[in-house]
Amino acid sequence: MAEQTEKAFLKQPKVFLSSKKSGKGKRPGKGGNRFWKNIGLGFKTPREAIDGAYVDKKCPFTGTVSIRGRILAGTCHSAKMQRTIIVRRDYLHFVKKYQRYEKRHSNIPAHVSPCFRVKEGDHIIIGQCRPLSKTVRFNVLKVIPAGSSSSFGKKAFTGM
């Protein structure tokens, strides 16, 4: 996924690759010729973002996007787009007339960096950022595989 498939040479804007010093011949990511940052908020930078060779300007770890605003959790509903997934958030809505709850959901498109491997059913934590496209305003910060046990171990809608 990190191969150069575009017609133009992809490079990180903050990294100078034409150095005449001892770093000659080293690939970005192997010799320290890679820009990455700690986004804070208690999220660790993935190993693939530090050691990888991909170039993604919309990645929160290696690009120019900052995370601010809401932090949300949900389940990956669709991973069919390129570098974009649909996160489904289930919730309960109270109907006053009947004194009951009804199930509802919302779909949120989110940009996924190449440092993550996301499949349908995985639990996702996303963070709000500036608008990345017409509909995308969130970025994937953490992926919890579907089979692992974590804080998502409880079933949804158990209060009924």
From Swiss-Prot:
| Pfam families in the record | Ribosomal_S17, Ribosomal_S17_N
**Primary residence:** cytoplasm
Subcellular localization, as worded in the UniProt entry: Cytoplasm
**Which biological process, per GO, is one annotated for this protein?**
translation
Q: What keywords appear on the UniProt entry?
A: Cytoplasm, Ribonucleoprotein, Ribosomal protein, RNA-binding, rRNA-binding
Alphabetical list of SUPFAM superfamilies matching this protein:
Nucleic acid-binding proteins
Q: Which InterPro entries match?
A: NA-bd_OB-fold, Ribosomal_uS17, Ribosomal_uS17_arc/euk, Ribosomal_uS17_CS, Ribosomal_uS17_N
Q: One GO CC annotation, please?
A: plant-type cell wall
Task: Determine if rRNA-binding is one of this entry's keywords.
Answer: yes
Annotated Gene Ontology MF terms?
Answer: mRNA binding; rRNA binding; structural constituent of ribosome
- Which NCBIfam families did the record assign? PRK08572.1 (NF006345), uS17_arch (TIGR03630)
Q: Which family does it belong to?
A: Belongs to the universal ribosomal protein uS17 family.
* Name used for this protein in its record: Small ribosomal subunit protein uS17z
